[in-house]
Design a protein with these regions (language model features):
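Non-catalytic, C-terminal membrane-associated alpha-helical segments of glycosyltransferases
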Residues: 59, 65, 73, 77-124
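Conserved nucleotide-sugar donor-binding catalytic segment
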Residues: 1-82
């Protein structure tokens, strides 16, 4: 299957969902600067993109550059309830948002995760 995303991602769009994967990412350090990844077990890539998007919008390169395999027992295979907890933790602890905002962003992320599956995943 091939997973794509929106062609242009703004700060608002990035808080909706982490559209960017870290497998094949390039960013211009002269524009964005040095970005340190948050020291959290899960979603550290998302935490990084939330920092990047503060300085520049993101754009989709509409090419398949890599393959990604998920194996049994990997951190990427967590249960859905566990993923919800990690998203909440990201918004609450890393982004330092109030509880209600962290809950809202977590729920918003779930909704856009479903939209991504319906609209941006294609079986090849």
């Amino acid at each position: 299957r091939v997973i794509t995303g929106p062609k242009h991602i703004t700060k608002f769009g990035m808080f909706n969902y982490c559209w960017i994967g870290c497998l094949t990412v390039i960013y211009d350090m002269s524009v964005v600067g040095l970005i340190q990844i948050a020291d959290i077990k899960k979603n550290n890539d998302y935490a990084m993109w939330l920092k990047v998007i503060q300085k520049a919008d993101c754009y989709l390169l509409n090419e398949n550059l890599a393959s990604y395999r998920v194996r049994t027992g990997s951190i990427s295979r967590l249960k859905k309830t566990s993923l919800i907890q990690w998203h909440y933790k990201l918004f609450r602890e890393v982004e330092k948002e109030p509880v209600i905002v962290a809950v809202f962003n977590t729920m918003r992320n779930l909704i856009f995760g479903v939209i991504k599956k319906w609209y941006y995943e294609k079986n090849v």
